[in-house]
Regions:
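Extra-cytoplasmic beta-strand recognition segments
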Residues: 12, 46-88, 118-122, 132-134, ...
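Extracellular beta-rich ligand/substrate-recognition surface
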Residues: 37-48, 110-111
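Extracellular polysaccharide-targeting segments
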Residues: 1-15, 114, 122-130, 135-172
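Extracellular glycan-recognition surfaces and repeat-rich motifs
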Residues: 2-42
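Short acidic, gly/pro-rich beta-turn/loop elements at beta-sheet edges
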Residues: 20-22, 49, 74-78, 92-94, ...
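Extracellular carbohydrate recognition and processing domains
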Residues: 93-128
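Collagen/collagen-like triple-helix recognition
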Residues: 157-217
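Cysteine-dense, low-complexity repeat segments
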Residues: 1-3, 11, 27-31, 72, ...
Length: 217
């Protein structure tokens, strides 16, 4: 099984945003979830975002990961939205793979080295999909803190083919004999068999008594 991260520069270790595009977004070494760099989305009464197109195949279900935190205290974090959308090769919208809303003031404080680690599974890419559009944005609200973003990943997990069938295991021991079942009904009488051979002649019996003398002529 192989795991491929479709996002390029997801940890911002290039020291710049590209190939991400963004608005009110910069990179910084002041904070990081891993490595040295992260992205900062400006808080307050402005909309800030980073976005990137990545290649996908139709039918793929992907795993999305990102680490988020807010910068500074006591300012609350703004509402944050995360979207993964599917497009064809002509940039026609085909469907939503993921929409996640993180409510107002739900992000931990980055200065405490605490992060909200997001892990979500997308719906499979519909037929005709060639690209996924990843968008991470804040919603404008005065007085809210900057948002720190790091370790963005969209993982394609590819499983290997089915291996050959293993050898048959040994035969298990014979189980105990079950209880004797009930006697079945008496079957029908069979046909009369053929007559047997004539037996041997018996022994001669004893001579009978002498009969009476007849009358004188």
């Amino acid at each position: 099984m192989s795991i491929q991260n479709l996002v390029v520069n997801g940890g911002f270790e290039n020291g710049a945003l590209p190939p991400w595009v963004g608005q009110n977004a910069t990179v910084t070494t002041q904070f990081s979830h891993s490595g040295f760099w992260s992205a900062r989305l400006l808080g307050g009464a402005v909309t800030s975002f980073i976005a990137q197109f990545v290649p996908v195949d139709a039918g793929e279900g992907l795993e999305f990961l990102v680490s988020l935190a807010k910068e500074g205290f006591p300012a609350p974090s703004p509402q944050v939205q995360i979207q993964v959308s599917y497009f064809d090769s002509s940039f026609n919208f085909l469907g939503q793979g993921l929409f996640l809303n993180i409510p107002f003031n739900r992000l931990p404080i980055v200065e405490n080295n605490t992060w909200l680690e997001v892990y979500q599974t997308t719906t499979p890419a519909p037929a005709g999909s060639t690209m996924a559009f990843i968008l991470i944005n804040t919603l404008p609200q005065a007085g809210t803190a900057n948002v720190i973003v790091d370790d963005v990943a969209l993982l394609d997990v590819e499983g290997g083919g089915t291996g050959p069938t293993g050898p048959t295991g040994p035969t298990g021991p014979t189980g105990p004999t079950g209880a004797t079942g009930p006697t079945g009904a008496t079957g029908p009488t069979g046909a009369t068999g053929p007559t047997g051979a004539t037996g041997p002649t018996g022994a001669t019996g004893p001579t009978g008594a002498t009969g009476p003398t007849g009358a004188t002529g």
